[in-house]
Amino acid sequence: PLISGMKLRERSVGNIVAELEECVNKYDIRNFFFRADTFTMNKKSVIELCREIINRRLNIAWVANSRVNTIDEERLTWMKKAGCWLVAFGIESGNDEIQKIIKKGTTRAQAREAVKLCKKLGVKTYGFYLIGFPWETKEMIMDTLQLAKELRCNFSEIHIAVPYEGTEFHKIARDFGILTETAVGHNYFSNPAI
């Protein structure tokens, strides 16, 4: 299935804070992970959310996903004040050509800047990388490994690229005839593994 789609869907700040308050006050939950890939996309909403977390004295610790090109000092400063202790980045590749092919819309330079900013402000980092694209050369893979080594995120994961249905990678893999019908079906997330 298409994992996230192309349309940005946001919850309102009020809706998010109400849920956080319920978790804190009713269940004493104080650790959260904002899983949205686009959490930092809307600067105004991020800052408003952080202000609300602070103003309501929720005293929570949290982690968020972010793109490397949607983080800046003001946003990250507010996030840290509101309890964010780690930002996870989908860096994907250390090769700008691969980034263009997969239409990531980010560069190595932006990854370096984002991780550097987090280190400056004392926010831990988690880097996610992908290797194994059919058009990827050994040198391109080494670029990714070198970038991961250079960035020295607090945590890193390197995954083998999977052509999920509905993605550009799936279309390319099918066009090249390298994808079997059963490799990653349309109901990949619906079927139990065992």
Feature locations, PLM:
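C-terminal accessory regions of radical SAM enzymes
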Residues: 124, 139-194
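Short, solvent-exposed beta-strand edge segments and adjacent coil->beta transition regions
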Residues: 36, 128, 191-193
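Radical SAM [4Fe-4S] cluster-binding motif and immediate context
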Residues: 1-126, 146
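Short, well-ordered beta-strand elements within core beta-sheets of diverse protein domains
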Residues: 5, 132-133, 194
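Short, solvent-exposed turn/loop segments enriched in Gly/Ser/Thr/Pro and often Arg
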Residues: 35-42, 67-68, 130-135, 159-168
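Alpha-helix C-terminal capping/termination sites
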Residues: 9, 134-137
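A broad, structure-centric signal for solvent-exposed, well-ordered loop/edge residues
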Residues: 41, 78, 105, 109, ...
